[in-house]
Amino acid sequence: MKVLKPGLLTTVQDIGRTGYQKYGVLASGAMDTVSLRIANLLIGNGENEAGLEITMMGPGPSFHFSKQTLIAVTGADFTLRINDEEAPLWKPVLIKENSTVSFGPCKLGSRAYLAAAGGIEVPAVMESKSTYVRGSIGGLHGRALQKEDELNIGEMSALSQTILSRLSSQLGKQGFAAPKWSVSRGRFLPLKKNPVIRVLEGKQFAFFTEESKTRFYEEAFRVTPQSDRMGYRLKGEPLELKAPLEMVSEAVSFGTVQVPPDGNPIILLADRQTTGGYPRIAHIISADLPIVSQIMPGEHVQFEPVSLQEAEALAVEREQHIKELKTRMKMEWLT
């Protein structure tokens, strides 16, 4: 595949560079890992296969595929076109050779994921193909995609070959073929503007004033333009500590909510540092991380406390849905 237009920020990502944070190496990986995993499953790839993460702000990217290719596109709600024909999201799509795939205006969300059967072929760095642009690590030459870049696609699995073969018989004058069914976005990614995000109390929650603790759950914080894959900087009435707090830097995770001295929270994301020295007021539950990853700058976000038991139940429920999808895919194409 060849990049015709790269868009604002398009990078190669998989689930992330796990196991190396103890050495100070960032995890990176897809912001919305659920959407990438599902895109891969829809076309017979392994869940962690590398795909493209496309930031849907400004003009969208476009790609040329020289060979017949099986793809799936998930994530944000936007218009996908194949050779100027509107094409479906959240389902396997077989495109003809010499086809152009274009990403149009985004209606809701901020990131799309394109997976190709066989996966995007780039060298693995520390067991991951994910791109960390600031460190020039992984992906294609450690950077975002540029116009005229060419990407190779790997060998297809047996399941991918079966899906491609079945859809090939449906190719007609239209530039693509797809099954009638699709995965429900709402089941895996319930997008909503200005979402309410569920959190667990952070280690230093008790060190904030009672007024600030109440405000944290009642205020709608604005996501500022100074937000990126490293973290979302929020703006609202500053949160205050009861007394100055000196901290030793500790490990942080995807979804940690830190409060720097200016009192405006920061949500740490995929390209977060491995440690942080600011008070941690909360941690976003894993079930809501995909929703957070789809928030656009300018939107507002509110926080809602939940129990650890509820957070665990929601995480288990999501993984069960993904397991059911894997089973359904095999039954759909192999029986």
From Swiss-Prot:
Disrupted gene: phenotype observed: Disruption of the gene decreases sporulation. Deletion mutant grows less well than wild type on minimal medium with ammonium as nitrogen source and cannot grow on 5-oxoproline. Mutant lacks 5-oxoprolinase activity and accumulates 5-oxo-L-proline.
Induction profile: Induced by glucose when readily available sources of nitrogen, such as ammonia or glutamine, are scarce. Transcriptionally activated by TnrA and repressed by KipR.
Listed GO biological process terms: sporulation resulting in formation of a cellular spore
Pfam families membership: CT_A_B
InterPro entries (UniProt xref): CT_A_B (IPR003778), Cyclophilin-like_dom_sf (IPR029000), PxpC (IPR052708)
SMART domains in alphabetical order: AHS2
Enzyme Commission number(s) of this protein: 3.5.2.9
A GO term for molecular function: 5-oxoprolinase (ATP-hydrolyzing) activity
Class of this enzyme: hydrolase
Keyword annotations of the record: ATP-binding, Hydrolase, Nucleotide-binding, Sporulation
Reactions catalysed, as given in the entry: 5-oxo-L-proline + ATP + 2 H2O = L-glutamate + ADP + phosphate + H(+)
Quaternary structure and interacting proteins, as annotated: Forms a complex composed of PxpA, PxpB and PxpC. Interacts with PxpB.
Function: Catalyzes the cleavage of 5-oxoproline to form L-glutamate coupled to the hydrolysis of ATP to ADP and inorganic phosphate. In addition, counteracts the inhibitory action of PxpB (KipI) on sporulation, by binding to PxpB and preventing its function as an inhibitor of kinase A.
Family stated for the protein in its record: Belongs to the PxpC family.
Name of the protein in its database record: 5-oxoprolinase subunit C
Species per Swiss-Prot/TrEMBL record: Bacillus subtilis (strain 168)
